[in-house]
């Protein structure tokens, strides 16, 4: 226990010698119960009287030491929220981060904050993420580490631009670049302030005075330096490739910027491509009188005009079939004959079968342009999952298609512009038509006119959409800047071998995503972001970038911010020596490029700005599962590319927040829960009560965050009930420590009651498990351990046993002080155990501890500190053997008051009897430690059957197996419990049935009153 008091003296429990005054110091190393274990949830004993349970105290009320504390049992309405604000102020929440940074400690813990997007109000997803991080940080800080946690915000990009333009009701073309940037910056700054205020209110400890922002000039400059380092190594290049393209946003998108609509409806068609030149090996199967067509299926008819080839699977089996309805001959995969015939509502007769490799050398005529040749080509991406086993290939509109085109030098012309419209190159019938709308209609009609469409139907499938505009995207070839992932991938995967993933399956997910990613497009055609520092020749397809130009721009950006790219003339963006070589001020042949860096590159280089040392790795990255393909991956790739190491040692991945029934939260469903409403309550407190931040934090810690996390009124109400029970436990502890000073009143462990020593043993084991769970970031297990301990071990078990000793013994009696010594240690361990999760409650308790005279902050007093001498496995078994007998007794009198019965325990001579003698030296006692455990009027311990038995008594039997010295000695002992109604009267002071007459005090109470 270390509440900021001076070190404990020799009388304190933690430094006292082991042993006990009640018997030999050595206990059996292992005791066991055959067929029976102690029930942690003690049976409720109806009518179990205590002096506290009646409003009528009688004439002895003032002699009973009832709990005294100002710690409230409940905080009603806004009291919880108001108390938390008061605690934050009083206990210095805002100064805690700087205080711990100034400590002279050797270890440091760095949690690198993944930047939330600065485009809206704080939501429960933010709460889940930030509170998980805070729990981890507070634990490591209390354990003695100097925590490094700098919050950040992702401030650039399309989502903010989209929101700004939407609020203004204009499109990007009607505003200048600087107008958009200024409004976007203001929007982001406002969102940051809202979010920051909420995070502070949730109790998040962080370096709030030195947050990082991706629009900060110094951050932008460091990002550009990483970009150029990668460019210099040949890892960044410009190329014409197909990328995900958003017509609504008029920019390229990364895969992480896509959302998939599972209910998207596409128009699919079966199209035939007339065989122009048969493959050499199949010439004998075809003749001019029976023309053959290759049959393909596509869900994107608009790409047919851009077709350059048809791909097949070389190792698959194919066939020439004859359609029974039309008599036409078609080539398709053998495995697809039946499903395609069914789809076309016809039958096929197989004319010939052959291997896919036999298709080599064949060509088809384009179904819209007969004189255009589409060769048959082998490809590895062809599957038999859907379609015909033959794939229409448009290199400008597919990643795999592009790969095939690169191998075979096919044209890659793109017929679609930035707005998703057909260009004039597509022909007058298609020009200026939206490819995903009327453009598709026209293409299908054109194919029908040439009689090359066999069937058209709608298909519902998952389709990618722009994550902000929610509209469908397409794949479109354009000149973009890319990161060469192929050259980094092996090193990135190797670096992950030194990284711990929580849960472990997240590693496989991340490596799978890396394997599936062919390249990373890092350029965007927008203005709110960091410019790619490249100058393009005005008339040639050339660009200018070198160390001189980049370093010059980096210095300008560091001093003035990235606005300079749009505000300064090109002549000032180039260093003088380069400017002279590029035509001079009056005849400059280059203009600044119009592309900005992808926001994933923006945030993915945060390690270069935030981690204090360029070689430093963060101890923990903790984000949602969507970041496995987002920030985790971009951070890994940029760090490995420039430093040859992963930026993190541990990666923890959590799920998303959902409504109470597992449904996605949305305004239309009316199930969006605002964290501020959770904390402060809604307009109607009867429907939306104020819970406070700690209940929000408890819900998060308790949830299985590695899957989807549900939230709603019932789970919040359950969390409130949990904390209410915890408050009652804490109130009991605080109330019974009044008048106790650990420095002067603690009882040495060897002199403590057995049950009190047993509780020290339990809390040492509890503390070890709690610490291990925090180390593993298994906060759900922490909560489960806490709930089991304070509800079962404390409230239901220990407190029910020791109330009489606390309330009715003399204030300074060693027996009472023994219990208070245990209570003080329990309180110390318990509060520290939940402090990282419930910081406000921990500080509130700290303010009410009677022997802490100048409370400041529990977080400044360290982690749990237990003593090795508390660990006594033999003692644990001794108590549990007595508890097994106690459970037998209580189970025999359901619904009745245990104090109205006497217990006779009969045990044959042996080890079990000797153990019970340690708890009760005399034959019969109403004040022994054994009787305290039994909660009976009195307990009698015998080695043989009593000479006389009472009619109507209850007899119970059981057997124990006792293991000594690690199992070297094994002894089985049987016992008998006889339950007899007591003939004694209830004492008017302690209410135990131990008095001779109804108006007389029991001997113990008479002695206590007499001493006073």
UniProtKB/Swiss-Prot annotation:
The modification N6-succinyllysine is found at residues 56, 74, 194, 241, 479, 500, 775, 781. It comes from Mus musculus (Mouse). GO terms for cellular component: mitochondrial matrix; mitochondrion. A motif ('KMSKS' region) lies at residues 664-668. ATP binds at residues 664, 667. SUPFAM superfamilies: Anticodon-binding domain of a subclass of class I aminoacyl-tRNA synthetases, Nucleotidylyl transferase, ValRS/IleRS/LeuRS editing domain. A motif ('HIGH' region) lies at residues 116-126. It comes from the Eukaryota. It is an enzyme of class 6 (ligase). PROSITE patterns: AA_TRNA_LIGASE_I (PS00178). The modification N6-acetyllysine is found at residues 74, 233, 241, 725, 775, 781. Keywords: Acetylation, Aminoacyl-tRNA synthetase, ATP-binding, Ligase, Mitochondrion, Nucleotide-binding, Protein biosynthesis, Transit peptide. InterPro entries: aa-tRNA-synth_I_CS, aa-tRNA-synth_Ia, Anticodon_Ile_BEm, Ile-tRNA-ligase, Ile-tRNA-ligase_type1, Ile-tRNA_ligase, M/V/L/I-tRNA-synth_anticd-bd, Rossmann-like_a/b/a_fold. It catalyses: tRNA(Ile) + L-isoleucine + ATP = L-isoleucyl-tRNA(Ile) + AMP + diphosphate. Its main location: mitochondrion. Its EC number is 6.1.1.5. This is Isoleucine--tRNA ligase, mitochondrial. The keyword Transferase does not apply. Belongs to the class-I aminoacyl-tRNA synthetase family. HAMAP family: Ile_tRNA_synth_type1. Residues 1-48 form a transit peptide. It is found in: Mitochondrion matrix. Disulfide bonds: none annotated. It holds the Pfam family zf-FPG_IleRS. Aminoacyl-tRNA synthetase that catalyzes the specific attachment of isoleucine to its cognate tRNA (tRNA(Ile)).
């Amino acid at each position: 226990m270390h509440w900021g008091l001076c070190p404990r003296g020799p009388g304190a429990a933690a430094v006292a010698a082991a042993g006990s005054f009640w018997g030999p110091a050595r206990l059996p190393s292992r005791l066991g119960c055959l067929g029976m274990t102690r029930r942690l949830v003690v049976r409720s004993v109806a009518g179990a009287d205590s002096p506290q349970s009646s409003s009528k105290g009688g004439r002895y009320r003032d002699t009973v030491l009832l709990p005294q504390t100002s710690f409230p049992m409940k905080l009603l309405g806004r009291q919880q929220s108001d108390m938390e604000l008061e605690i934050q102020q009083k206990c210095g929440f805002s100064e805690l981060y700087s205080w711990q940074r100034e400590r002279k400690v050797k270890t440091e813990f760095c949690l690198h904050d993944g930047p939330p997007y600065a485009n809206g109000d704080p939501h429960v997803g933010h709460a889940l993420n930030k509170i998980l991080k805070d729990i981890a940080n507070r634990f490591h800080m209390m354990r003695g580490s100097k925590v490094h946690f700098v919050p950040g915000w992702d401030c650039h990009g399309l989502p903010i631009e989209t929101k700004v333009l939407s609020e203004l009701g204009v499109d990007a073309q009607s505003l200048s670049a600087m107008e958009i940037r200024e409004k976007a910056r203001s929007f982001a700054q406002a969102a940051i302030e809202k979010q920051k205020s909420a995070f502070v209110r949730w109790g998040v400890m962080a370096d709030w005075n030195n947050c990082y922002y991706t629009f900060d000039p110094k951050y932008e400059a460091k990002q550009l330096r990483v970009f150029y380092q990668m460019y210099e190594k040949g890892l960044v290049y410009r190329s014409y490739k197909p990328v995900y393209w958003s017509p609504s946003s008029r920019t390229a998108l990364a895969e992480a910027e896509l959302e998939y609509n599972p209910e998207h409806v596409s128009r699919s068609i079966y199209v035939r491509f007339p065989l122009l030149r048969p493959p050499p090996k199949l010439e004998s199967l075809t003749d001019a009188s029976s023309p053959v067509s290759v049959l393909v299926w596509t869900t994107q008819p608009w790409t047919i005009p851009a077709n350059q080839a048809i791909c097949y699977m070389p190792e698959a089996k194919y066939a020439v079939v004859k359609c029974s309805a039309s008599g036409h001959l078609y080539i398709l995969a053998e495995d697809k004959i039946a499903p395609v015939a069914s789809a076309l509502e016809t039958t096929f007769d197989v004319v010939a079968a052959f291997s896919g490799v036999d298709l080599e050398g064949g060509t088809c005529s384009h179904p819209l342009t007969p004189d255009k040749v589409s060769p048959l080509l082998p490809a590895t991406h062809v599957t038999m999952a859907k379609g015909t086993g033959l794939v229409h290939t448009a290199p400008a509109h597919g990643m795999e298609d592009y790969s095939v085109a690169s191998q075979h030098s096919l044209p890659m012309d793109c017929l679609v512009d930035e707005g998703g419209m057909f260009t004039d190159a597509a022909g007058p019938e298609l020009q200026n038509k939206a490819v995903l709308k009327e453009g598709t209609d026209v293409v299908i009609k054109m194919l029908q006119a040439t009689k090359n469409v066999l069937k058209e139907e709608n298909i519902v499938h998952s389709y990618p959409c722009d994550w902000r505009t929610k509209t469908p995207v397409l794949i479109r070839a354009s000149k973009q800047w890319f990161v060469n992932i192929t050259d980094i991938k092996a090193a990135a995967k190797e670096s992950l071998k030194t990284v711990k993933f929580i849960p472990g399956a997240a590693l496989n997910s991340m490596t799978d995503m890396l394997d599936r990613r062919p390249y990373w497009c890092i350029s965007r055609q927008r203005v709110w972001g960091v410019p790619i520092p490249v100058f393009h020749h005005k008339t040639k397809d050339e660009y200018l970038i070198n160390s001189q130009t980049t370093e010059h721009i980096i210095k300008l950006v560091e001093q003035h911010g990235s606005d300079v790219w749009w505000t300064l003339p090109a002549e000032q963006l180039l260093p003088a020596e380069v400017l002279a070589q590029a035509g001079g001020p009056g005849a400059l042949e280059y203009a600044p490029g119009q592309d900005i860096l992808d926001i994933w590159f923006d945030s993915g280089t945060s390690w270069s700005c935030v981690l204090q040392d360029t070689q430093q790795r963060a101890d923990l990255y903790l984000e949602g599962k969507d970041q496995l393909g987002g920030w985790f991956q971009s951070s890994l790739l940029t760090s490995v590319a420039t430093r040859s190491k992963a930026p993190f040692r541990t990666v923890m991945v959590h799920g998303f927040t959902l409504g109470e029934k597992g449904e996605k939260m949305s305004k239309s469903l009316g199930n969006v829960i605002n964290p501020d409403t959770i904390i402060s309550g809604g307009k109607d407190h009867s429907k939306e009560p104020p819970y406070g931040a700690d209940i929000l934090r408890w819900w998060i810690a308790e949830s299985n965050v590695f899957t989807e996390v549900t939230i709603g009124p019932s789970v919040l109400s359950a969390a409130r009930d949990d904390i209410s029970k915890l408050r009652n436990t804490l109130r009991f502890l605080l109330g019974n420590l009044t008048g106790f000073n650990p420095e002067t009143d603690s009882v040495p462990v060897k002199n403590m009651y057995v049950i009190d020593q047993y509780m020290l043993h339990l809390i040492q084991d509890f503390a070890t498990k709690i610490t291990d769970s925090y180390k593993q970031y298994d906060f759900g297990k922490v909560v489960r351990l806490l709930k089991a301990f304070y509800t079962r071990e404390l409230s239901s078990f220990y407190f029910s046993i020791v109330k009489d000793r606390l309330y009715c013994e003399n204030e300074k009696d060693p027996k009472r002080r023994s219990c208070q010594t245990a209570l003080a240690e329990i309180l110390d361990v318990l509060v520290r155990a939940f402090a990282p999760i419930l910081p406000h409650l921990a500080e509130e308790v700290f303010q009410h501890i009677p022997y802490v005279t100048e409370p400041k902050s529990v977080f400044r007093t360290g982690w749990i500190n237990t003593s090795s001498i508390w660990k006594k496995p033999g003692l644990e078994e001794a108590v549990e053997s007595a508890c097994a007998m106690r459970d037998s007794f209580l189970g025999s009198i359901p619904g009745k008051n245990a104090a109205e019965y006497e217990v006779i325990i009969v045990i044959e001579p042996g080890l079990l009897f000797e153990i019970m003698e340690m708890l009760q030296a005399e034959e019969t006692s109403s004040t022994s430690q054994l009787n305290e455990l039994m909660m009976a009027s009195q307990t009698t311990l015998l080695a043989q059957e009593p000479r006389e038995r009472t009619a109507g008594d209850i007899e119970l039997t059981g057997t124990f197996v006792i293991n000594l010295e690690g199992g070297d000695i094994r002894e089985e002992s049987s016992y008998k419990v006889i339950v007899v109604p007591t003939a004694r009267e209830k004492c008017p002071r302690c209410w135990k049935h131990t008095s001779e007459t109804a108006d007389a005090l029991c001997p113990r109470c008479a002695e206590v009153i007499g001493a006073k």
